[in-house]
Amino acid sequence: MIYFLKKSTPSKKGLYLQIYSNYYDPNTKKKNTKSYKALGYVSDLKASGIDDPVSYYSDIVKQMNEQLLENKELQISDKSTQKYAGHFLVKAMFDLLDMDRTINIVASTHKWQYKFSDMYRTLCYSQILSPGSKLKAFERVIPNIYDAPNFSYDQILDAVNFIGGDYHKYIEVLNHHINDIWERKTDKVYFDCTNYYFEIDLETPFLKKGPSKENFKGPIMGQALLLDSDQIPLDTEFYPGNESEKPYLRKRIEDMKSRNGVHGRIIQVADKGLNCARNIYAAVVEANDGYIFSKSIKGRSLSKEEQDWILMDDDEFNKWEDVRDEVGNLIYKYKTSKHIIRSGKNAGKVVDYGNYLYKCKINPDDEKETEFTVKEKRIVTYNPKLAAKQRAEINREVEKLKKILSYKIAVKEDIGDSAKYVNFEAKDKDGRKIKVATSLNQEKIDADLKFAGFNMLVTSEVKADPKEIYKVYHNLWRIEESFRLLKTYLQSRPAFASDEDTINAF
């Protein structure tokens, strides 16, 4: 479309001016014109004060065409007219923490062409506003963040590698500035691990095959996360996927104490995956700390006597205590393992804790295990809602297995975790042909159904109320929520990173 000044003489009054536009008519598939604005007779326009109406409106038409051309250029620009503003809450937190100067000092070992704190902020804003790769951040996110500086793609790559090369420094900066505003509570700390998988076939020095939370068979990496008493992250660590997560509990707590100047006694809280004799030794003997762990109640973790005690009804020493909501519905019930003091001035007294013997290798290359005794309270709980959920899951697995076993030879790799409910037995037929026979492991199924809803907590805090121990332990759902938020909303799986520093920075 373009504008032009049309001059005509429709009457004896003289020259008549109109602004016309031409356009393409899709119906006739031809160019056409139409009146955009009627201006009037030249004589009337002169009488209104315009000395030369033809020249005057010719200039206006020229300006209209220039504006039209400028608008067209804006429409085909590769820059979006929309701007992200959802980062203002995060920006306010950055401003409150006031850590730009510290970040720039930490990054001063390298010469940057910009304030490194601006890059640090912008990368965080980008990952919160629209999670994705570094290329996506460069092309589609950072240019559209309101009031944020732009960076070249090479600058982003360099900064990401620099951050990942020593990411603990930035965690230390965060903790330092948080401590300036809020007093961090570290009398209890929560610890858990997760892992991330990568769409690659071959292992790298950092990405190794190991047990995956998503049952992925390829290389993975692990992340250990430590939270304070308010369930605010304190520290994190990344490690190859083939390594055990258990040593990282000790390492993170040691680093957290030294970096944050924590000298008092703390209570380590973790699930049964972190419960091992070496971690208990590190907490109680080496660090003079305490612990609250869950403990497996099936298999070889407990003696037959203790397993029978878990299922036992009330007797003279062991009584279940109900915990109910305000309308009287049972939330859970609990009991503690009772012991009789055999000697001393309190001989014959019944207490809800006992001395338990543990043994472990202090160093991996030690020839002998070290034995040590811990004064420990053991609390068993029963949750009816959890019991119903677990029984439904077991029955669903069993029904699925029955269908599989009825029409094919089951292979452990096909069944996955459900293999625990299947007996695999090699049978020799006439000494020539070996066939693998499969059958349901009814004993295992019955045992799991029997213990559904039960859980055991073990703690060094023998004077603590069992309900308080239960409450503290179940705050672990916060760390699980942290991982869930990271993996879902923030897409924290570093699918677009390959080397260790980039993965850590992501």
Summary of predicted features, one role per range:
Residues 1-118:
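Conserved glycine(s) in the ABC-transporter nucleotide-binding domain "signature"
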